[in-house]
Amino acid sequence: MRIDGVRLWALLYELDDPAHLEMPQGFDWEAARRQFDGLVARFNSAFQTTCATDRSIEDASYHAEVTVPSDATATGADLVVRVSNFGNLAVLALENPGAYDQEEFDALVHVSDLTRIFECLDEGDYILVPEEPLWAPYDGRVPASVFLQSKPSWWIRYFDYL
């Protein structure tokens, strides 16, 4: 499932709980890991490769990251999916998060890669959110002093180290 616009912002604000910074109340780490491992297996199959993963995440609002290597994509560049600890949110980036704006991303990523990624995410019940809006200044309920960086963003709130 993909979400953007008003629905995206409503969901981000709904998930924002100042009492639970790194993961929501009741977060089931083992279930999240099984869900992520299933995603990686689907990517490996869909792209006929072995994707790189980063599963050793601590002190962060995201759970893990998987990279589809450039040589397995029609795009010819790495495709990175980062999975949040919140609301089954996932984000797709070209090469590295923050490297491209939405217009560049849309122009560079091959539609066949998008189709495969969308299908894999949908099968895992992830909600794909666009990356670019997440770089907007954070104006949620968590005090700005909690964030390590001087300019907190929605990206940091749900997809980065705190």
Across the structure, where does each feature detected by a protein language model lie?
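Amphipathic, interaction-prone secondary-structure segments
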Residues: F36-A90
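Short, extreme N-terminal segment that most often corresponds to the first beta-strand
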Residues: M1-R34, W154-L162
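Short glycine-rich, low-complexity/disordered patches
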Residues: H20-D37, N44-Y62, E119-D139
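Non-membrane alpha-helical secondary structure
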Residues: I3-R7, A31, Q35, E58, ...
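Type-3 copper protein
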Residues: L92-N96, Y100
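Generic detector of well-ordered alpha-helical segments enriched in charged/polar residues
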Residues: W9-Y13, D37-V40, L114-D122
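Alpha-helical protein-protein interaction elements
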Residues: M1, T75-D78, L92, I127, ...
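Acidic, proline/glycine-rich low-complexity IDRs
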Residues: Q102-L162
